[in-house]
Amino acid sequence: MQIRMDKENRELKAHGSYEFPVNISYEQLSRYERGSFSWHWHPEIELTFVLSGQIGYQVNGKSYVLKDGDGIFCNTNALHSGHMIDGMDCVYISTTFAPRFLYGFSNSMIQTRYVEPVLTDMQLASIVFSPEIDWQNQVLACMHR
């Protein structure tokens, strides 16, 4: 299996529907060709929570090693990929959603004041969450529910 993309590496998979723009999936790196998924991007936000194993995760040129209990926020339009480490499998939950799921209506106060500043900040292409940091562990608990 591999991610279907267009010529610009935009993922072609629908992440939910217009009525409910959210997709939650149970993923396993060994299901992908060579234990990795290709560089791709999408206009949705993606949250990844590692259930077991480790994943080498890259976002816009930054590399991370995520292990059991870690998570990552991958911003809209960020180019990202992932691969097995030392041939060991990784199981994770991927939650992908359209930003409008957070703000509802275009040009709402929530969109303009809170969501858009995060989506357009080039320094926030990704944020790693570790269970060792209290506030991040609270975020991870929500991601794992």
Give short role names for the model-derived ranges.
Residues 1-67, 71, 77-78, 112, ...:
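Generic protein-terminus/edge-of-domain signal
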Residues 2-23, 76-144:
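A hydrophobic/aromatic-rich effector-binding and dimerization subdomain
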